[in-house]
């Protein structure tokens, strides 16, 4: 992984009055570009092949310029060009997934956030070590041969809802498992899914204070999954099973949510614990992150995963959410990222938020 010292040397040669935001044209890039534009920062879209035509339909979010590469593996080749343009890279799920964790970790361009989190987020065992070390309640790990109730089986690195299936017993597990893929088997939690969108700032001082910096809860969403969200219109689970139809969990979109106000203290406590643990483990998780949770009918909150960067569910709120509007009107996660970068440049603290 490229060192903080190397990144600091690159930043020292940047014109801090002419910074640019760069990201891959996918996932949440429209929101990122829109937020940067609203904060007066230049924008650079990295795209494979021709620039996306549909960006022309959204002129306020269209990047100021494009850099075209033939494949994601070619992105390191444009590092010097990005540096010449005073670019700061904003990672999102597609960026890291398609480029590859190792290549992204070595990219010689200042990047918003702490790249050390990649090691802890991409490995489900280390992710569990982090979250349980923070005192977070997670679904229990189950021995496949001892499955007595429904379990969720997840392949490591599964993205966008792919690589998941539910098994009711060991026979069903054996029927669907790919033994060559690393996987996790955990209890299936019955409840309502909430994806909680947080933002951790080590340099702001006003707000929900932590041991260092502040925590913000900007929004929340629930994912729309195909075909799980509509499949039971066709019949009962038993009827579907008899017909050879099985639920899948591919994310196709997102819907907005708010939580009961009485749950907000617990929601903030979850975010606080995760950030405080990250400070001790790897120097802190900077910027946006999402806790993927299930709220049970006993009002327990179980965390089943963390995404340590901007998530696509925040795209619902390019003009603000019911929560972020109470921080600042029309505040999106993309805009909040741009604000943090501007504040870091103004206060001489970019080293704290870039890696």
Swiss-Prot record:
Per UniProt, residues of the ATP-grasp domain are 101-332
> Binding residues for Mg(2+), per the UniProt record?
292, 305
Which Enzyme Commission number(s) are listed? 6.3.4.23
Q: How is the cofactor bound?
A: Binds 1 Mg(2+) or Mn(2+) ion per subunit.
Keywords of this entry: ATP-binding, Ligase, Magnesium, Manganese, Metal-binding, Nucleotide-binding, Purine biosynthesis
Q: Pathway, per Swiss-Prot/TrEMBL?
A: Purine metabolism; IMP biosynthesis via de novo pathway; 5-formamido-1-(5-phospho-D-ribosyl)imidazole-4-carboxamide from 5-amino-1-(5-phospho-D-ribosyl)imidazole-4-carboxamide (formate route): step 1/1
Q: Which residues bind 5-amino-1-(5-phospho-beta-D-ribosyl)imidazole-4-carboxamide?
A: 27, 94, 254
List, alphabetically, the PANTHER family matched: 5-FORMAMINOIMIDAZOLE-4-CARBOXAMIDE-1-(BETA)-D-RIBOFURANOSYL 5'-MONOPHOSPHATE SYNTHETASE, 5-FORMAMINOIMIDAZOLE-4-CARBOXAMIDE-1-(BETA)-D-RIBOFURANOSYL 5'-MONOPHOSPHATE SYNTHETASE-RELATED
What job does this protein perform? Catalyzes the ATP- and formate-dependent formylation of 5-aminoimidazole-4-carboxamide-1-beta-d-ribofuranosyl 5'-monophosphate (AICAR) to 5-formaminoimidazole-4-carboxamide-1-beta-d-ribofuranosyl 5'-monophosphate (FAICAR) in the absence of folates.
- This protein is called what? 5-formaminoimidazole-4-carboxamide-1-(beta)-D-ribofuranosyl 5'-monophosphate synthetase
Organism, as annotated = Methanococcoides burtonii (strain DSM 6242 / NBRC 107633 / OCM 468 / ACE-M)
This protein's gene is called purP
